[in-house]
Amino acid sequence: MPCVQAQYGSSPQGASPASQSYSYHSSGEYSSDFLTPEFVKFSMDLTNTEITATTSLPSFSTFMDNYSTGYDVKPPCLYQMPLSGQQSSIKVEDIQMHNYQQHSHLPPQSEEMMPHSGSVYYKPSSPPTPSTPGFQVQHSPMWDDPGSLHNFHQNYVATTHMIEQRKTPVSRLSLFSFKQSRPGTPVSSCQMRFDGPLHVPMNPEPAGSHHVVDGQTFAVPNPIRKPASMGFPGLQIGHASQLLDTQVPSPPSRGSPSNEGLCAVCGDNAACQHYGVRTCEGCKGFFKRTVQKNAKYVCLANKNCPVDKRRRNRCQYCRFQKCLAVGMVKEVVRTDSLKGRRGRLPSKPKSPQDPSPPSPPVSLISALVRAHVDSNPAMTSLDYSRFQANPDYQMSGDDTQHIQQFYDLLTGSMEIIRGWAEKIPGFADLPKADQDLLFESAFLELFVLRLAYRSNPVEGKLIFCNGVVLHRLQCVRGFGEWIDSIVEFSSNLQNMNIDISAFSCIAALAMVTERHGLKEPKRVEELQNKIVNCLKDHVTFNNGGLNRPNYLSKLLGKLPELRTLCTQGLQRIFYLKLEDLVPPPAIIDKLFLDTLPF
């Protein structure tokens, strides 16, 4: 049976001791004639890594692929392998594979006479593709019969069955790669290239395994089919530091949850924003139904019930208040004929007489609501330290203490209301003199209006701007009869069920109005008209105003009542000045003198 054998021959004279020569023969034995110097071409020094072939070199696919029972007679191919420094080699681990077995029954003398680098024996499995064009061969998978690697003596002549009985794994081999030659390249210019040592684990790799070589990822399919029977570009293999067993990281699991936001009301998962705030679908629907139905809820506890994912349905009042506290805007909820149509225009209007809803200035009313919310004390931070509902409290203490408390409550509210006024859109654009005039003229009106809206007249509980909570009886000796008028106004105001948006517009109109002595009354009038139109649109289309006739007139009718209450407040301050028990603060004295109507 023809076979190919590689012999580690003796180096010719003048050759480097590290030089190695391999000869291929087809007769089944080795001839020393091919190892004579005339067949050897020494064209490189010890640092050169090229190998010159004197005859035609088969393609690498042919060299590695076709192993069967015969091999055609080929011209001898002589390889000169000079090594410099340390030998470039492949380290084969002591791991057995299915076709690589260790045999330890070689003669001792043969093992001693073997060279350090070893020799290579390839068992052919099929005829290779000759270099002559037009020669047809049968192709077969590359790794069906990979053969074995063996070491043997330089003069050892072996047949196929002898080699299979006396084979041991090679410890070190030379690493090489073939490169495709250009068309018309002379036969003598075929080259093999050494790329340095490489550590190759011999354990079997599964099909489709991925490896990384020089930063490039490639896969080893199973089985590997032989490409076209011609040369192909050489595969550049990196140094030993880049191992072939590096695995590509697995892709991230598709079942990992996405990082969605949380509902600002209850803490449940929220995918997007609804009515200006990131909320879940449950809180969005609850807020929408509450606004559309204009529902009024009552808290059975202390109006501070916990609102979370598990307990959000226990108290509707506290849940709706938290929706407003986190910034959900009621004006965005549609309550007209387009409700539930997701922005699609109706095919036919219900009746041609129904007025089409204009686009309300959402930015203005939203800014007014935000300014009101920011200037009000939080319900969870109220100060009940001085609250007493004892009717005998008004008889305790002296008058100076109650008068001083009255002045303190006024001055404490002044800075808070001024901060609220500066957040009204367009107010800061007015002249500074007009701003001061409008604020000082409307301070007592705003003090009464805001106090009446947040207080609880049924229980006689008064909540001031700084968060202090007092009973009505605790304010009688300081406020006089004025406190009774405030409580009565508060009761009438809350009976109207004014929502926070409408109240914010009313509070702005109480200050932005015509006053005597304005430098630019035209600009004040323009701002006033914007707020009135905003309130009108809100009441008409978003607050059930179509079913509540004269509701807008009733809201605007509260402004003259505030003027009357403001006059009562000035009279109370004037009376306290006449008593002269406690001197008023300078800011209150200036306010009194600047706003006297007489």
From Swiss-Prot:
GO terms for molecular function: DNA binding; DNA-binding transcription activator activity, RNA polymerase II-specific; DNA-binding transcription factor activity, RNA polymerase II-specific; nuclear glucocorticoid receptor binding; nuclear receptor activity; protein heterodimerization activity; RNA polymerase II cis-regulatory region sequence-specific DNA binding; RNA polymerase II transcription regulatory region sequence-specific DNA binding. This is Nuclear receptor subfamily 4 group A member 2. Keywords: Cytoplasm, DNA-binding, Metal-binding, Nucleus, Receptor, Transcription, Transcription regulation, Zinc, Zinc-finger. A motif (Nuclear localization signal (NLS1)) lies at residues 338-350. It comes from the Eukaryota. GO terms for cellular component: chromatin; cytoplasm; nucleus; transcription regulator complex. A motif (Bipartite nuclear localization signal (NLS1)) lies at residues 287-314. A zinc finger (NR C4-type) spans 263-283, 299-323. Disulfide bonds: none annotated. GO terms for biological process: adult locomotory behavior; cellular response to corticotropin-releasing hormone stimulus; cellular response to oxidative stress; central nervous system neuron differentiation; central nervous system projection neuron axonogenesis; cerebral cortex development; DNA-templated transcription; dopamine biosynthetic process.
